Amino acid sequence: MGPPNSRFLWTDIIGDTIWQWTPGVGKQVLIHPSSHANGMTFDRDGRLVVAGWSARTIWRVEKDGSLVTIASRYQGKKFNSPNDIVVRSDGSVYWTDSAGGLVIPGMVGEDLQRQLDIQAVFRLTPQGEVKLTVEDTVYPNGLCFSPDESILYVNDTRLGLIRAFDVNADGSVCNGRVLHTLTGTEAGVADGMKCDQEGNVYCTGPGGIHVMDANGALIGRLRIPGHATNLAWGDDDWRSLYVTTYHFVFRTRTKIPGVPVW
């Protein structure tokens, strides 16, 4: 992502590090250890909000640089391993919670014990309540809102599909339906996902980035060498699309800008 001050941030999950790249400076460690940080985004106050895989929490970087846990349990039980994350304009934080992080090297003892019998989508309300939002998922991963936030998109790595949900005024969702099923035999799975300002959905998948319109029709693919893991728009005009793979970061310019995160 391209936050203020022209920095690009990305996570190295196995390396347990959040990195930053700044023009004229280059690559630097931002946070280490990072609780094997996975997905991250910014809230409307410009604070970095992070899905902590090994910490099994959602945490935030305050303006003074301190790290604060904002969600850690649902009904008294630890989350599995928060995967990806998005913030709604009212301040609600939504994230996917799958069990992949329970096998990260270096996790020991109680941290390996799964306490929830579901892999789901949760949200933290502006009032600080954790709400179960989508529970009929197999392995939820990427998620994003449509530009007007009327639809929440959630993909499922195991099933290889993207679902769409209507968002109610209170932040709950309804009317879940399959938007698109990813196809292909090349490297890549349903993982990171974002929307552009015209409502098209960009999702990692076999061979790179699959682009669908709001009706689920495939309108194009962006070929990426290697296994694409996540993506984010950045730069001042939000027309630069950054894509991570297991070992590299790629950048391309797009005709349609992405949805800003602040």
Where in the sequence are the language-model features?
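A short loop-to-beta-strand structural motif that recurs across blades of beta-propeller domains
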Residues: 17-19, 57-59, 119-122, 161-163, ...
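Beta-rich, blade/repeat-based domains predominating
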Residues: 1-8, 33-52, 57, 75-93, ...
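Short, conserved, GDST-rich strand-edge loop motifs in beta-rich repeat architectures
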Residues: 95-116, 254
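Short loop/turn segments immediately following beta-strands, especially the blade-tip
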Residues: 164-172, 254-261
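Short loop/turn segments immediately following the C-termini of beta-strands
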Residues: 13, 53, 98-99, 157, ...
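A detector of repeated loop/turn-to-beta-strand junctions in beta-rich toroidal repeat architectures
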Residues: 15, 55, 115-118, 159, ...
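A short beta-strand motif characteristic of beta-propeller blades
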Residues: 25-31, 68-75, 129-135, 175-183, ...
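Beta-propeller domains
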Residues: 4-32
